């Protein structure tokens, strides 16, 4: 084992938030606060931009009771960003600034909690620090409700979003069957290139049929076939519920839901949305049926009230493991998961090279999609069902959630 490196730790959060990203942060922060070799624990305010702007939060000055509420508090408590640092060979301005801040606060440990692009940031910083000879151990902590990080069995945040989607589909199904006239309901889920979230609608079918069709971005979308499938099911049942990913593409690669403004986020990804309403209008015109389009939108990633207990525990484990491994001398890794479902369900942490993870996407397996391309198989249900087990321990005050309230004391 490598000798424990003495110095401060920074943890940052990046990209879209989730219901359990703060559980990962808590695992990191609590473990770091209890480690004798870590002198200070800082939170990067709004991710890597907080480092660049010298805006670091003193986590050791927060009340313990408030920190203890972090695992059950949604969104990114430290603030997030969508800032993509350039390749240092092209422009090393940001890296020089990061090094300057690291030296100022004697930072020897850096954790970055995020998805694909965040792991790229992590990897670039790690390599730059090695290049300039500054000893700093870097670890990626996974976070993405899209569940598309390469290598790991699944990502913290996905299970809670999946649980919310499945629960919502079950509730919408009850509502849709109230009237004798029947209805077509189209539910839009997040997922730009990977269909893991939308597939979660299949979990709603375990007790009784709720979701009739599921359309994923891994399958080219055919509008005529979609209309025919839904129309036929509606004629048969006088009700039809469809789950569709925001990122379903036409055969030419263009998104069905791509915004006309061609707006993009900070990482250059097209901003999608509005697909449910578009498809609802088309179905209404073609069938004359009552049609409703529902966009789950941000609710998928912040519904802490029905978070998965398993997800919370595993998110905490990923943050805790990151610090433990860095103290042991490990660097330039992502803390992922290795799971066994052969006899029940077990999950343990597994380290992956950041270079093998950065900027790669894990697609939904083709073999888990039905031959018709409009649903998923039982293999997916067996994969996902263990992940959504267990309940949150979210504290309630006057019937409403009591989330963590951080003082956010900035380092000077």
Task: State where each predicted segment sits.
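Short, ordered loop/turn segments at secondary-structure junctions
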Residues: 14-16, 44-50, 82-83, 115-116, ...
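N-terminal phosphate-binding or glycine-rich loops at protein starts, especially the Walker A/P-loop
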Residues: 2-55
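Gly-rich Lys/Arg/Thr-decorated short loops/hinges at beta-loop-alpha junctions or inter-strand turns
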Residues: 5-11, 70-84, 143-153, 180-183, ...
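Accessory alpha-helical/coil subdomains and C-terminal extensions
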Residues: 101, 109-114, 120-135, 139, ...
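C-terminal non-catalytic interaction/assembly regions of soluble proteins
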Residues: 258-412
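Glycine-rich oxoanion-binding loops at beta->alpha junctions
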Residues: 2, 53-108, 117-118, 156, ...
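Short glycine/serine/threonine-rich phosphate/pyrophosphate-binding segments
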Residues: 18-28, 51-52, 94-96, 116-124, ...
């Amino acid at each position: 084992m490598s000798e424990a490196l003495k110095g401060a730790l920074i943890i940052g959060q990046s990209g879209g938030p989730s219901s359990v990203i703060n559980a990962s942060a808590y695992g990191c922060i609590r473990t770091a606060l209890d480690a004798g070799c870590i002198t200070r624990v800082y939170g990067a305010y709004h991710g890597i931009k907080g480092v660049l702007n010298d805006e670091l939060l003193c986590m050791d000055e927060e009340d313990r009771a408030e920190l203890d509420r972090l695992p059950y508090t949604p969104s990114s408590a430290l603030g997030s960003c969508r800032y993509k640092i350039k390749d240092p060979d092209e422009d090393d301005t940001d890296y020089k600034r990061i090094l300057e801040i690291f030296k100022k606060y004697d930072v020897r440990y850096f954790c970055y909690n995020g998805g694909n692009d965040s792991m790229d940031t992590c990897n670039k910083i790690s390599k730059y620090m090695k290049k300039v000879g500054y000893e700093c151990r870097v670890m990626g902590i996974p976070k993405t409700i899209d569940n598309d990080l390469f290598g790991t069995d699944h990502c913290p945040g996905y299970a809670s979003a999946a649980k919310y989607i499945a629960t919502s589909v079950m509730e919408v199904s009850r509502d849709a069957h109230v009237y004798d006239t029947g209805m077509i309901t189209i539910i839009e889920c997040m997922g730009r290139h990977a269909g893991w979230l939308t597939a979660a609608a299949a979990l709603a079918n375990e007790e009784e049929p709720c979701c009739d069709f599921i359309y994923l971005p891994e399958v080219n979308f055919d509008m005529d076939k979609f209309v025919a499938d839904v129309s036929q099911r509606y004629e048969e049942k006088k009700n039809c519920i469809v789950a569709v990913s925001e990122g379903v593409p036409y055969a030419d690669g263009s998104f069905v839901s791509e915004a006309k403004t061609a707006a993009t986020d900070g990482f250059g990804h097209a901003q999608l949305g509005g697909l449910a309403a578009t498809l609802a209008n088309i179905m209404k015109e073609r069938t004359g049926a009552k049609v409703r389009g529902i966009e789950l939108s941000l609710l998928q990633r912040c519904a802490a009230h029905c978070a998965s207990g398993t997800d919370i525990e595993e998110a905490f484990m990923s943050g805790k493991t990151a610090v433990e491994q860095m103290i042991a001398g490990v660097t330039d890794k992502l803390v992922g998961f290795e799971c066994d479902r052969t006899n029940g369900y077990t999950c343990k942490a597994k380290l992956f090279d950041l270079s093998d993870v950065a900027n790669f996407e894990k697609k939904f397996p083709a073999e888990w999609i039905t031959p018709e391309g409009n649903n998923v198989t039982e293999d997916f249900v067996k994969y996902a069902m263990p992940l959504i087990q267990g309940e949150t321990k979210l504290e309630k005050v006057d019937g409403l959630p009591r989330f963590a309230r951080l003082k956010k004391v900035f380092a000077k």
